[in-house]
């Protein structure tokens, strides 16, 4: 699916991560059972170093509220002027109601501000931006997009294959109506591979072997039960590489934007080696492809792209391509124009005493 919008702009972005910081080197004994070779390999290939993890009482809404309030205050936005609040997450506070409605209360928004969730993972920022642009194209004025996850809650802390890879974080983005600003999107999904990245148990469907195409996800072990995240790492890597390469090429062709005019190519920060492979295959300049979020925050799921935008030193006006791939399977790319983008260094959320 490809589409173009011309009525919306991204005015600002803030990202919040929890205060508990973990360094992978400190987990040599507790997580890696003194397997120094595996630890060093994960650091080198995936790009891991530190990550931030929520405690049991901190959820998406807490980080979202922190990021949203900071953003709205920084932009001097009247909360009553917001037309919609969208929360994109795979780790909601509750099954019912939506996290957006709960956050609506926490932010003390007007009853005229519609609130709803979108269930997307690593490609979720692009899906959220797509929906926000669609709504503004139809006449809305201001949309607050909250995007991110607390996936550490679905991973056993001693699972050395997954625990070091995922960090927690949530972004807040303000999208506003403007006179003219082109934005191009290319999105896709393939449900045949729904079980390649999945939490099999915990919702309404009872997990049974005949439901899944991947037999190995039903094979539990000491540090992975059916309530925990399962990832077919090798296949996910290969499909992410193929999908992001194809999506990137298609969005450039569709937008008719010259690659030389794009300041940054932002790829979902799930694996430093994967980003390097994409960059080399597309023959992109190193300085256009930032690749450092994994080292500082690990895989922030749908929050990794907004985290990149917050951490980059961007000019007053620039074009960027954004690409991501995640559970579903879902993927997407966009070419966006930015002007006077408000950002702050990534925020550390401290629980209120």
Label each region the model flagged:
Residues 11-14, 88, 119, 143-149, ...:
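Short beta-strand segments
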Residues 67-83, 245-263, 312-313:
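Phosphate/pyrophosphate-binding loops at sites that engage ATP/ADP/AMP, CoA/4′-phosphopantetheine
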Residues 35-41, 94-108, 145-151, 216-220, ...:
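Acidic-glycine-rich active-site phosphate/pyrophosphate-binding loop
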Residues 83-91:
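Membrane helical hairpin/interfacial module
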Residues 1-56, 159-238, 337-353:
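Condensing-enzyme catalytic core mediating Claisen C-C bond formation in acyl metabolism
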Residues 141-170:
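Flexible, glycine-rich active-site loops centered on histidine and acidic residues
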Residues 61, 65, 91-92, 105, ...:
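Claisen-condensing/thiolase-fold acyl-transfer catalytic domains that form or cleave C-C bonds
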């Amino acid at each position: 699916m490809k589409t173009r919008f011309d009525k919306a702009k991204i005015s600002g972005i803030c990202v919040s991560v929890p205060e508990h910081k973990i360094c992978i080197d400190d987990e040599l004994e507790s997580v890696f059972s003194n397997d120094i070779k595996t630890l060093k390999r994960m650091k080198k290939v995936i790009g891991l170093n530190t990550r931030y993890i929520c405690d049991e009482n901190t959820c998406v809404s807490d980080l979202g509220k922190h990021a949203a309030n900071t953003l709205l205050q920084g932009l001097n936005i009247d909360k009553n002027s917001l037309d919609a609040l969208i929360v994109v997450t795979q780790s909601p506070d509750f099954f019912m109601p939506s996290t957006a409605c709960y956050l609506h209360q926490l932010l003390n928004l007007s009853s005229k501000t519609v609130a709803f969730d979108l269930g997307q993972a690593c490609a979720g920022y692009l899906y959220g931006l797509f929906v926000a642009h669609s709504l503004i194209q139809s006449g809305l004025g201001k949309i607050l997009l909250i995007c991110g996850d607390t996936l550490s809650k679905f991973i056993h802390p001693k699972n050395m294959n997954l625990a070091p890879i995922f960090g927690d974080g949530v972004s807040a983005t303000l999208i506003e109506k403007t006179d003219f600003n082109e934005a191009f999107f290319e999105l896709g999904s393939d449900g045949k591979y729904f079980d390649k990245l999945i939490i099999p148990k915990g919702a309404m469907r009872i997990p049974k072997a005949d439901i899944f195409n991947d037999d190995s996800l039903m094979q539990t072990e000491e540090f992975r039960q059916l309530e925990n995240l399962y990832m077919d790492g090798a296949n996910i890597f290969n499909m992410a590489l193929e999908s992001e390469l194809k999506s990137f090429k298609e969005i450039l062709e569709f937008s008719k934007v010259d690659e030389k005019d794009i300041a940054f190519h932002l790829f979902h920060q799930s694996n430093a080696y994967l980003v390097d492979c994409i960059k080399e295959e597309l023959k992109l300049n190193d300085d256009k492809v930032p690749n450092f979020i994994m080292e500082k925050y690990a895989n922030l799921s749908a929050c990794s792209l907004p985290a990149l935008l917050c951490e980059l030193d961007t000019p007053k006006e620039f074009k960027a391509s954004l690409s991501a791939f995640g559970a579903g399977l879902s993927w997407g790319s966009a070419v966006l124009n930015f002007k006077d983008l408000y950002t702050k260094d990534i925020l550390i959320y401290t629980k209120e005493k």
